[in-house]
Design a protein with these regions (language model features):
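Conserved hydrophobic/aromatic pocket- or pore-lining residues that grip, position, or stack substrates
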Residues: 104, 198, 227
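A short, contiguous, amphipathic alpha-helix enriched in charged residues
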Residues: 152, 191-204, 246-249
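Conserved small/polar residues in nucleotide/adenosyl-binding loops
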Residues: 324-329
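Short, solvent-exposed loop/turn segments at the edges of secondary structure
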Residues: 59-61, 99, 170-172, 220-224, ...
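Active-site-proximal, well-structured secondary-structure segments within enzyme catalytic domains
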Residues: 167-178
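Loop-rich catalytic cores of soluble enzymes, especially ATP-dependent carboxylate-amine ligases
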Residues: 176-186, 203-313
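ATP/Mg2+-dependent ligation/transfer catalytic cores
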Residues: 1-168, 190-193, 207, 320, ...
Length: 334
């Protein structure tokens, strides 16, 4: 489940043993230890909402994604999924699809290593060679942590998540996996469970995976979660007008979106390193320096999807999708 830490929530998990063939029950936890309750009223409720085969334990074991509820079974204030479920239902006839590109950075966690606390591929002090050869690279001099990325991708497949690819990113030790296209709220479930699997699998290498949007200051790329979006109207022949309409709609609420796309977004959206500045909105074909990129093939086909390049790696996929279903989907449906 997702805890109540701010400005960036974390994942929590625990193990329950149940009878074979029974459904996961309503459960609970100490909310005072997760910033979701006070000590004198500490109980919070776990409501199972999605389950997946557990690729870590194997067998008949499952991973259960839960919403956090109050004891009266109303959604907890930290529960961002519940609002998305309602919004997605309202716009279901427009069949919104999402594809999210989750970037992350591996860090060394061995206390006896001179590289403790450094991104993988960084020397004990100073910096590696400048960016340029690491993106989608191959070879021990360019790529760091591939075995973890591969193990994670395999686990996502075994869990039935909608993973569609992985690649090494621009900065050493930085990787990305893609989930989608998947509808809402499922896309959020898949991203959060994929994050949990990433953290859990990296444990076995004594490596941490972080979603820090600007892991290294200076001339190094940040980490985002580019969000690809389309509706039925955008995917149909002649849907290019609906794509442009969605871009215009997103521009009207640009400030609201940026404020809810992940903490410390100003550190990443600077106008450099393939970003538009956080206080400027733009869209364009093939433009990775724009807020919204329209892929060149979409312009050729006159239908398809858009890519929002603003969301941070640490953004909440439920919140991002909620903003889209209430803004872009609403506008293109008219």
């Amino acid at each position: 489940w997702i805890d109540g830490l701010t400005p960036t929530a974390k994942l929590r998990s625990k193990t329950k043993i149940i009878e074979q063939g029974t459904e996961p029950p309503i459960w609970g936890f100490d909310g005072s230890s997760t910033q979701q309750a006070t000590g004198d009223q500490s109980d919070c409720v776990l409501k199972p909402v999605a389950q997946f085969p557990d690729p870590v334990r194997g067998g008949d074991n499952i991973l259960v994604m839960c919403e956090v509820m109050n004891v009266d079974m109303t959604p907890h204030a930290s529960n961002t999924r519940a609002a998305l479920v309602e919004s997605a239902s309202n716009f279901s006839e427009f069949e919104p699809w999402f594809g999210m590109e989750q970037e992350y950075t591996f860090y060394e966690q061995s206390y006896d290593s001179l590289k403790y606390g450094q991104p993988l591929g960084f020397p004990p002090s100073g910096y590696p060679a400048p960016q340029g050869g690491y993106y989608c690279g191959v070879g021990a001099d360019e790529v760091y942590g591939r075995e973890i990325s591969e193990a994670h991708a395999t686990a996502c497949i075994e869990a039935g998540l909608g993973i569609s690819g992985t690649n090494a990113e621009v900065m050493p030790g930085q990787w990305e996996f893609q989930i989608g296209p998947v509808g809402a709220p499922d896309i959020g479930d898949h991203i959060w469970v994929a994050r949990w699997l990433l953290y859990r699998i990296a444990e076995d290498w004594n490596i941490s995976a972080t979603l820090n949007p600007k892991p290294v200051k200076g001339d190094w790329n940040g980490a985002g979660m580019h969000t690809n979006f389309s509706t039925k109207q955008m995917r149909e022949d002649g849907g290019y007008e609906a794509i442009v309409a969605a871009c215009e709609a997103l521009g009207k609420n640009a400030d609201l979106h940026v404020k809810n796309y992940g903490a410390d977004i100003e550190d990443r959206l600077t106008g450099d390193h393939e970003t538009q500045s956080y206080d400027t909105f733009s869209y364009g074909v093939s433009d990775r320096g724009a807020s919204i990129r329209i892929p060149w093939q979409v312009e050729v086909d006159k239908k398809g999807y858009l890519e929002d390049r603003r969301p941070n790696a640490n953004g909440d996929p439920y919140v991002i999708c909620l903003l889209y279903t209430s803004d872009a989907a609403d506008d293109t449906s008219r």
